């Protein structure tokens, strides 16, 4: 299945999706190792390590951009797919050099799906559907 969205940050990555149905704040929401520590998150206790993070949109502090940058530079966060990207998440992905596509119907993607995020064209492919 192929979903057409909007390119925010360039690059192409294939990997396993981890999907949240709730908006996410990177400041206080995730630790340095990529573990989700926000107790209000539907992904509390899970890890972003080596995954493509799919969530509706970001919320919270501008420091979140630097958290995303740090996760990307440590090789923990591989890519992002949003329903609606906002400047904090966009800045972090661009600085971190990870692909980001938004305007995607994230309801089509499930945790564990193998996906390809093409930040050059704005396309997300779900390989196992």
UniProtKB/Swiss-Prot annotation:
GO terms for molecular function: hydro-lyase activity. One of its GO terms (biological process) is isopentenyl diphosphate biosynthetic process, mevalonate pathway. The active site is at 61 (proton acceptor). InterPro entries: PMDh-S-like, PMDh-S-like_dom, PMDh_S. Keywords: Isoprene biosynthesis, Lyase. It catalyses: (R)-5-phosphomevalonate = (2E)-3-methyl-5-phosphooxypent-2-enoate + H2O. Its EC number is 4.2.1.182. Pfam families: AcnX_swivel_put. Coiled coil: none annotated. SUPFAM superfamilies: LeuD/IlvD-like. Pathway: Isoprenoid biosynthesis; isopentenyl diphosphate biosynthesis via mevalonate pathway. HAMAP family: PMDh_S. Heterodimer composed of a large subunit (PMDh-L) and a small subunit (PMDh-S). Component of a hydro-lyase that catalyzes the dehydration of mevalonate 5-phosphate (MVA5P) to form trans-anhydromevalonate 5-phosphate (tAHMP). Involved in the archaeal mevalonate (MVA) pathway, which provides fundamental precursors for isoprenoid biosynthesis, such as isopentenyl diphosphate (IPP) and dimethylallyl diphosphate (DMAPP). Belongs to the AcnX type II small subunit family. This is Phosphomevalonate dehydratase small subunit. It comes from Methanocaldococcus jannaschii (strain ATCC 43067 / DSM 2661 / JAL-1 / JCM 10045 / NBRC 100440) (Methanococcus jannaschii).
